[in-house]
Amino acid sequence: MTLRARGARLLGGLLFFTLLAAGAAPLSWDLPEPRSRAGKIRVHPRGNLWATGHFMGKKSLEPPNPSLLGTTHHISLRDQRLQLSHDLLRILLQKKALGLSLSGPASHTPYRRLLVQTLEK
């Protein structure tokens, strides 16, 4: 083979290899981003939790309203006694309606009688 044939064959192989490599490469020419400090930030898959709770609450520039600070109802001692007496009256009326004795601790006397009668048989 002559020198000219070898050169043509080498040139053809090189051209074939170039076309093969160009076909395997992506069709768009993506230029790499310039290296800067922004490119060196590590991103964690779960996200960066550094400032998670920083902006959680509402930030307000106005001073808080004093009427909103005391939103809990302060019940006086007299109101508490009145509420307790109403609750006691309601409980006593329920016990009377059910036929339970009003004196003494709440016992299961009607059920106890039934249980004793059942066990004696």
Curated annotation (Swiss-Prot):
- Signal sequence range: 1-24
Task: Identify the GO cellular component terms for this protein.
Answer: extracellular space; neuron projection
What biological function has been recorded for the protein in this entry?
Answer: Stimulates smooth muscle contraction. Induces sighing by acting directly on the pre-Botzinger complex, a cluster of several thousand neurons in the ventrolateral medulla responsible for inspiration during respiratory activity. Contributes to the induction of sneezing following exposure to chemical irritants or allergens which causes release of NMB by nasal sensory neurons and activation of NMBR-expressing neurons in the sneeze-evoking region of the brainstem. These in turn activate neurons of the caudal ventral respiratory group, giving rise to the sneezing response.
Q: What's the name of the protein?
A: Neuromedin-B
Biological process, per Gene Ontology: antiviral innate immune response; Leydig cell proliferation; negative regulation of interleukin-6 production; neuropeptide signaling pathway; positive regulation of hormone secretion; positive regulation of interferon-alpha production; positive regulation of osteoclast proliferation; positive regulation of respiratory gaseous exchange
- Classification via PROSITE patterns: BOMBESIN
Q: In which tissues is it expressed?
A: Higher expression in the central nervous system (CNS) than in peripheral tissues. Highest levels are found in the olfactory bulb. Relatively high levels in the CNS (including the cerebral cortex, cerebellum, spinal cord, medulla oblongata, midbrain, hypothalamus, hippocampus, and hypophysis) and in peripheral tissues such as the pancreas, adrenal gland, testis, ovary and cecum. Moderate levels are found in the rectum, heart and pons with low expression levels detected in the bone marrow and duodenum. Other tissues show no or low levels of expression.
From which source organism is this entry? Answer: Sus scrofa (Pig)
Q: Which UniProt keywords apply?
A: Amidation, Cell projection, Cleavage on pair of basic residues, Immunity, Innate immunity, Secreted, Signal
Q: Which residues carry this modification: Methionine amide?
A: 56
Please name the GO terms that the record assigns under molecular function: neuromedin B receptor binding; neuropeptide hormone activity
Any one Pfam family here would be: Bombesin
Q: Hey, which family's this protein in?
A: Belongs to the bombesin/neuromedin-B/ranatensin family.
Instruction: Check the record and name the InterPro entries matching this protein.
Output: Bombesin
Q: Where in the cell is it found?
A: Secreted; Cell projection, Neuron projection
Q: Which residues form the propeptide?
A: 60-121
